[in-house]
C-alpha cells in the first residue's frame, strides 16, 4: 500500500540522515498545550528547531543570496526521494522534511526550480491526496508561510493531525447525515459534483470544498480563487490550502490571508511573537520556537494574531458575494461566415463544422436556432482557452491581413444573422474590481 510505503520511506531516510533523525526524535518530546481560538480547540507546539523557518528572511534580495535548499543539486547527500508524476508531465520529488512539525512530515518539491504557485498544480495536489490517502497535503502561498517561495512545493502529513481538518471533517459528516443544526458550514455554490461551503468558525476567510472528482473540484476551486482580491504585484491571492481524500471524495480547505506576519513579529515590545503563521498554524497547530512566548501565550493574544493575518470581514463578504451572484456577461462577436470550423478543447473531439441551412444552423445532422458551448471554467483570472475558431481574420485593412486559427477563453455562442453564421465569445466581467 502507498501509505505503508511512505512510512517505510521515512524510516529509510531517518536511518541514513542524522540531522533529520535527531529532529524527528526530538518531535516526540516537544511540549504541547491547548487553547481556544474562534471556537476551535487549537494546539501550541514549543518547537525550537522550527526557528529556521519562523525567522526566515523572505525578501527577494535575501532569497536571491541563498542556495535553494529544494533544488536537487543543493540537497544534502543523505537526502533520498520518491518520484511522483503530476498531470501534463509535471514531475515532483517526495522528500522527508528534516525540520518536522508532524510525524512522517513530507515535502513534495517540483523537480525543477520554479516559483511557488497553485495555478495548474491544484489537480496534482488532489492526485497526491488520492494516491497517498492516509495523508493530508497542504500548500503555503508564496506570501502565506512558504519558507521557499521561489521553489514550488507541497507538504504532506498524516491525516487527523490538524484541528481544523478534524473539525471540518466532523461537520461535513453531520451535513451528509442531514444534521445541519448549529453547523458552522453554510452552503454557497456547486459545480456538478463539487460543493462549496463557508466555515464560520476559527477565523474569517475559511472555505470548504468537497467533490467526488478532481475535475469538478478544480473548476470550483479556481472559481473561488478568482473571487478574491490579488495584492499588488502578486500572482495569486494569499492562501493556505489543504486537501485530503476520505469517504470517496476530495476535501479541500482554503484559508484566505491578508498578510504573512502580524505586527507581533516586528514588535520590540512585550507583545512580540516569533511566529510566522503558515499552513500548520492556520490549521490549529501553532508553532512557537521561543519558550517564554510559548508559556505566555493566551487565547486572546493568539486570536489577535490570527485575525490580523486573515482577510478582513469585508473582503470575506466580497468573496461570498462574487461567488453567489450572477456574473455579468459580455458578448463579443469574433467572426461571421457561411461555414464555421471550431474545436471545443475540453472534449478533445477535434474540428467540427456548422453551416447555414434554411435560415438555421446545421450542426451534427440537426438544425438549431443557436449553439452554445459552456466554458469549463467561468473565472477570469484563471481562465484557460476553451475553444478554437478556424480561419479568424486578423489585421483587417493592413498589409499583413491574414487568416489564422485562434484560441479563446469563455463560452462559444453561434447564431444566424443575415443568413451567415456569427461566432460570439461570451466572457464574464467584473465591474469595479482592481488589485489592492
PLM-predicted stretches and their roles:
Residues 150:
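Histidine-centered nuclease catalytic patch
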Residues 317, 321-435:
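Conserved, single-site charged/polar hotspot
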Residues 1-125, 135, 142, 147, ...:
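Active-site microenvironments that recognize anionic phosphate/pyrophosphate groups
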